[in-house]
């Protein structure tokens, strides 16, 4: 879903066979988009530091997902606490960082984690509210969400 100058993507476990596959697809997609953005910048003759995206990866088991029609156009959207929390994580991921919540990484199985070079047992988490890059809204609305850089 397109949101202002951002994009929200959903990775339903049912679509990816299981939760681990969905978590892996989410992480792989963020990494691929970040790499692609840098390639586009270089191809366009731009400094890669001038073309940066923020990534906030989160897990939500209970969002409302459905179709909403606005201005005669139907689009799929999701609503709920997890969606708002993901937005707070994303807002804190400055400088092209990929910030992933502990909730997301807990759904990543050992085989999928190894396939994408992640050792979930060695991850160091920081509470969102403790990040220097967390805006006031993130500090206020979701300070205790544990996140790590990927």
Descriptions of predicted regions:
Residues 1-24, 39-81:
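Catalytic core of nucleotidyl cyclases, primarily class III adenylyl/guanylyl cyclases
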Residues 24-35:
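Amphipathic alpha-helical segments that line or abut small-molecule/effector binding pockets
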Residues 63, 73-74, 85, 94-150:
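Intrinsically disordered, glycine/charged-rich C-terminal tails and inter-domain linkers
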Residues 82-88:
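Acidic/proline- and glycine-rich, intrinsically disordered low-complexity segments
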């Amino acid at each position: 879903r397109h949101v202002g100058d951002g994009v929200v993507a959903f990775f339903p476990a049912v679509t990816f066979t299981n939760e681990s596959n969905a978590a892996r697809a989410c992480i792989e997609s963020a990494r691929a988009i970040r790499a692609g953005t840098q390639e586009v910048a270089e191809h366009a003759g731009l400094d890669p530091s001038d073309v940066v995206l923020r990534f906030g990866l989160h897990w939500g088991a209970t969002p409302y997902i459905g179709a909403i029609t606005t201005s005669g156009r139907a689009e799929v959207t999701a609503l709920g606490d997890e969606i708002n929390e993901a937005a707070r994580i994303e807002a804190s991921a400055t400088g092209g960082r990929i910030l992933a919540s502990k909730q997301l990484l807990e759904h990543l199985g050992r085989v999928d984690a190894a396939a994408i070079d992640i050792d979930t047992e060695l991850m160091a988490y920081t509470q969102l509210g403790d990040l220097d890059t967390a805006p006031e809204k993130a500090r206020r609305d979701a300070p205790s969400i544990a996140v790590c850089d990927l």
